[in-house]
């Protein structure tokens, strides 16, 4: 597994397993399957309501905790210094661990400055190894990075071949913040898996469109957390380190970028309203 070095020196796997929308009742089994495939980085969140399943699977694996890299996120309903501080303790308990490897502000809403202060404090206390943000567009990212003491190590954003975040990735180099992709397969939108460019390139390497798409992001040093509840798909997603895309391949895939979200805008009032109500 290839690692990437964060801005505080912490080594983070480039590829992990995401549990967004994994049923809490199924999560332990799914994470156990992912661990057996070889995944050691697991991405969860307070709002996913499956942190317990992640913690159970890691505990039961019998593998040393130090071998794992656990990511979780502080939800909007826990925004603010006091609430975020309490929620971090809850996450530690649910995950059955003394520390979280990477803790993110999940959404740029509510008192996320207060949340971030609580995260900085947890970092200094050794309860968190690295901190960052999620879904922070360039303006909100820059504002937070400029004013905070500990610069975000990671910004997790919608990132896939149709929305490549080239400009944001370049901008974040100012504070050495790494880009982390959610939705690396765009949840199949735009006929993702039937894309002619991805499939034509895949034929050269005997790889699927999904594997080519993942490899493209990984070669750009973008951290990826593909999700599947099927073990065979977990294995396919994991088998992306035995081939290298050429410069021509990379250029071809770059032309697929629409620079537009395929999901939602964090500046859409209706979406913001929904996020603010969700999980309250």
Question: How would you describe each model-predicted region?
Answer:
Residues 22-34, 79-95, 114, 139-142, ...:
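Short, acidic/polar
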Residues 1-4, 52-59, 88-90, 138-141, ...:
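Alpha-helical scaffolding within the catalytic cores
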Residues 41, 99-102, 130, 154:
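Residues at the N-termini of beta-strands
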Residues 22-25, 45-53, 77-82, 108-113, ...:
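Acidic-and-aromatic substrate-binding clefts and catalytic sites of carbohydrate-active enzymes
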Residues 1-68, 185, 278-280:
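N-terminal binding-site loop/beta-alpha segment at the start of enzyme catalytic domains
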Residues 7, 55-65, 89-96, 121-123, ...:
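Acidic (Asp/Glu)-rich catalytic clusters
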Residues 73-121:
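Glycine/small-residue-rich loop that forms an oxyanion/phosphate-binding "nest" at active or ligand-binding sites
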Residues 107-280:
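Beta/alpha (TIM)-barrel catalytic core signal, keyed to glycine-rich beta->alpha loops juxtaposed to Asp/Glu
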